[in-house]
């Protein structure tokens, strides 16, 4: 990116390290945008329980520290958008031992409810929460085509 000046969009941030790298790149003035999947705002590796394959995702669920960093990144505008990460997997792909199960989950129908739940919990204004799933992704796409 430094050599070409190309815009970069990082999809589905899931770790504190990823949020920190975005902050560092922005301090350098690099043209960078990023998003996070709605489920990463709410779930952690603890939710996997005893290797529940329904929670086999890519990127994987991480620890509480990572989830807290993602929430902080949304609060301070480090993270530009919230996405659904909609990658449904049928029973044949999920009803397997955790290590063999396909990564993915149906996310489209949960995007709005999870975003609004986060906004209520964190006292985020409704307009801001809705922008993160509507106008912010649209702006990222427009910038990518400019």
Show the residue positions of the predicted features.
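Histidine/acidic residue-rich metal-binding segments in metalloenzymes
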Residues: 1-82
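His/Asp/Glu-enriched, well-ordered alpha-helical/loop segment
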Residues: 2-5, 54, 81, 87-146
